[in-house]
Amino acid sequence: MKYTIPCLFGLEALVADELRRLDLKNVRAENGRVHCDGGPADIPRLNINLRCGARVLVELASFPAPDFEALFQGVAAIPWEDCIPRDWEFPVKGYSISSQLHSVPACQAIVKKAAAKRLGQAYGCETLPETGDRYQIQFALIKDTAAVYLDTSGDGLYKRGYRAHNNGAPLRETLAAALVLLSRYRGRDPFCDPFCGSGTIPIEAALIAKNRAPGLDRRFAAQKWQSLPAKLWLDAAEEAMDQEFHGQYDIWGGDIDPSAVELSRHNAELAGVDDCVRFEVADAGKFHRDSDYGQLVTNPPYGERLLEKREAEALYRSFGKAARTLPAGWRVLVLSSHTEFERAFGRSAEKKRKLYNGMLKCDAFFYHGGAKTEPDKG
């Protein structure tokens, strides 16, 4: 079976590494998605274990589609009756990039019509009831080549099940996990987020430290598939739980807003990591730690979303002064979409990496503690 894992731009290498660790074969990455080969048992394994992928798609076919007739015939050739029961719903969604068939609604209609014709012929009926559960069909048209998939995940994998409410502009859990992994945190050193918001980054750090699979507390679309035995899901969950660590961890989140801290504590409890994460009301401008080593990973408020630009820059300036008090053994990673972040922070990044939080373009700025101040030229 061929799988495709869509992901936020910039996370492809992390997703590819996750797939290799899960022993998937023929892993290959391209912009915004990673492909691999596996068996039916890998559907639950991927959904339960992936931290940075957006969802798990089973590729059913790939074929040239320069026109509607080619698209129709390619979709109609797929043995839909082997996977979609007679009365199940099969909605269609997709996208088109650099293709002659650029109208997504028109392509959706063609894919739906072709799949319905094939199913109608197989089940001997002109009209399909679509009263049962859902098989979500997806397609991607890229440079006149169509790929057709079934979505095994349902809700995106960033929905871990622990964040019932958000405050302000949320950071996707998949991106939060990616930031933690990019910081090279593995659970041994102190970990801090002085702008914790709803607690997503510290919670994802705790899940990584404990090696707890992020999908254990939610359900997936493919759990209802008749073609996928329930035992595969039970085996995948048991395998994941057997690999959990149980230790003591120094993970801390702070926020100046008491309601954010309370929400973070609630979310940590839902995630099952409240025993290893502390949340406190704290001012990021006064952040300080004496330990020789540690990771600081944070996503301060973006000027264009939560604060006026001038307020945001003042916040970055005071936070930058605090970060410079950290010992040289600390690694600092800050995610921001602010184009003048480095100037306001008072230091040029040692390394930068382009990332996206949904459709919002950001940069991950990498530093070490103890660096000298650079003059603010603004």
Question: Where does each model-flagged region fall?
Answer:
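Non-catalytic nucleic-acid substrate-recognition regions in nucleic-acid-modifying enzymes
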Residues: 1-133, 377-378
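Flexible, glycine-/basic-rich loop-and-beta segments that form/coincide
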Residues: 45-52, 155-160, 164-165, 371-378
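A short, flexible beta-alpha/helix-coil linker loop
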Residues: 97-100, 156, 301-305
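C-terminal edge-of-domain segments
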Residues: 137-150, 365, 374
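SAM-dependent Rossmann-like transferase core, predominantly class I methyltransferases
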Residues: 148-184
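Conserved S-adenosyl-L-methionine
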Residues: 171-288, 305, 310-313
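C-terminal catalytic and target-recognition region of SAM-dependent MTase-like enzymes
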Residues: 283-286, 290-378
